[in-house]
Amino acid sequence: MMTDARTTAEGGMETSYGFHKVDEGKKQGLVNEVFHKVAKRYDIMNDVMSAGLHRLWKDAMVSALSPRKDPSYKILDVAGGTGDVAFRIIEASNRLAHATVLDINGSMLAVGEERAAKKKLSDNLTFVEANAEELPFEANTFDAYTVAFGIRNVPRIDVALKEAYRVLKRGGRLLVLEFSEVDMPLLDRVYDAWSFNAIPQFGKMITGDAEPYQYLVESIRKFPNQEDFATMIRTAGFSRVTYTNYTGGIAALHSGWKL
């Protein structure tokens, strides 16, 4: 068992499986198992974990991106297997842009591909099973890189951010939406009580298994706070790094540019 203190810009997430310390190299397999279990109920899980607010936060993320209405505009949505963010981006582009949805988990991608077909968005989307730490793309390929509620599950976040920088075109934008550190004294206590007591129990009711939800709640607490994560983005090479808190810091949208 490790401390519940947040990791920092110096690292630590690579050996943190929630509040449990694991050998470096083992975390990815453990995280994969979590998402194989929750794939078909992933968006319901996000509703439980955010009281439905993740939908508003994702809409705000897409508004901040303001994707070009242009067939040449290319987005890479990482850890986006179910397509929830990519669908929003394509719709915001009047179904003109193209999004590559990358996820390391095949179960999540299967859900996304099925949904894309039902929404008649398959022509605008490519689904790729790959690791965010080793992107299978050439440098300077994408206009935008997005990731929503997925970066904290990547073992080596610093490596993933450097890969994001590599595959973005000059002038390209990084947007990362992630649960973060609540900055309102009363809200932080309420949110902690909800997270550690209610969410695993709701997860058990929905899926019959509380363990994946326990990990996800603990991983939120371990993730670097807003300032530390902004530092990590700058260290990866990004410029004009900013963040916007949503709902008192329950979530934050970080932005950076490859200039």
Curated annotation (Swiss-Prot):
What Pfam families does the record tag this protein with? Ubie_methyltran
Q: What is the lineage of its organism?
A: Bacteria, Pseudomonadati, Pseudomonadota, Alphaproteobacteria, Hyphomicrobiales
What is the species listed in this Swiss-Prot or TrEMBL entry? Answer: Agrobacterium fabrum (strain C58 / ATCC 33970) (Agrobacterium tumefaciens (strain C58))
User: Which of UniProt's keywords are assigned here?
Assistant: Menaquinone biosynthesis, Methyltransferase, S-adenosyl-L-methionine, Transferase, Ubiquinone biosynthesis
Please report the name of this protein according to its UniProt entry: Ubiquinone/menaquinone biosynthesis C-methyltransferase UbiE
Molecular-function GO term, any one: demethylmenaquinone methyltransferase activity
Give a short account of what the protein does.
Methyltransferase required for the conversion of demethylmenaquinol (DMKH2) to menaquinol (MKH2) and the conversion of 2-polyprenyl-6-methoxy-1,4-benzoquinol (DDMQH2) to 2-polyprenyl-3-methyl-6-methoxy-1,4-benzoquinol (DMQH2).
What pathway is this protein said to act in by its record?
A: Quinol/quinone metabolism; menaquinone biosynthesis; menaquinol from 1,4-dihydroxy-2-naphthoate: step 2/2; Cofactor biosynthesis; ubiquinone biosynthesis
InterPro entries, per this entry? SAM-dependent_MTases_sf, UbiE/COQ5_MeTrFase, UbiE/COQ5_MeTrFase_CS
Q: What is its EC number?
A: 2.1.1.163, 2.1.1.201
GO BP terms in the entry: aerobic respiration; menaquinone biosynthetic process; methylation
- Family label: Belongs to the class I-like SAM-binding methyltransferase superfamily. MenG/UbiE family.
Where along this sequence does the record place binding of S-adenosyl-L-methionine? 82, 103, 131-132
Give the domain of life.
Bacteria
The family database entries (Gene3D superfamilies) matched by this protein are listed as: Vaccinia Virus protein VP39
Reaction(s) the record says it catalyses? a 2-demethylmenaquinol + S-adenosyl-L-methionine = a menaquinol + S-adenosyl-L-homocysteine + H(+); a 2-methoxy-6-(all-trans-polyprenyl)benzene-1,4-diol + S-adenosyl-L-methionine = a 5-methoxy-2-methyl-3-(all-trans-polyprenyl)benzene-1,4-diol + S-adenosyl-L-homocysteine + H(+)
